[in-house]
Amino acid sequence: PIDDIQVLCPTKMGMAGTKELNKQLQSALNPPSQNKAELKFFDVIFRTGDKVMQTKNDYDVLWTKNNEKGSGIFNGDIGIIRSVDRFSQNVTIDFEGRVAIYTSEMLRRLEHAYAITIHKSQGSEYDAVIIPITAFTHNLLYRNLLYTGVTRAKKMIIVIGTKELVKTMVDNNRKMLRYSLLRPLLEIEMNRKDTEETDDEKTQSD
């Protein structure tokens, strides 16, 4: 079943990124059929049987699970589209037993989840994981990312790529740097304090 196998990608972009792979995997695993209703939302087609993921926390989504009722579908939650109503443009999605009805407006918070980024997979586990590695993602070829992807698998892991690329990831122990204004601001503040201390020392010596 598609919910037991998860493709994990280092990035969204490129031929082996989530965007392109989701198009290809939807076409291969859940092609158009007269028995499957579908709804087009801008350039994305949501079809009965599609694997989808919530991309933002939404505390107002109502769901039912057996006789239980609740609310809230959260960033990273993965579900299967059970039905599409073309007339009302509502989509019914099963999030591991929690069944929610999405209006067409709510579809902007969904994306296909045949392939997701390794980052999005953190905290989740799957029976089988497939990780495609290409030279396009050379700036993401580091060990921690590979480790995160591999440890999502409970039973089987398949890494697709050349031995050289896999070895590059295993050997590269650096961590991704998060570039922001924090570092330069800290450097400015430290330089300012150093200047003040120097001025104080000069004043005292005078």
Where are these regions (language model features)?
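C-terminal accessory regions
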Residues: 75-206
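Conserved helicase/translocase motor-coupling segment
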Residues: 1-69
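Short, conserved secondary-structure segments in the cores of folded domains
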Residues: 42-45, 69-72, 80, 116-117
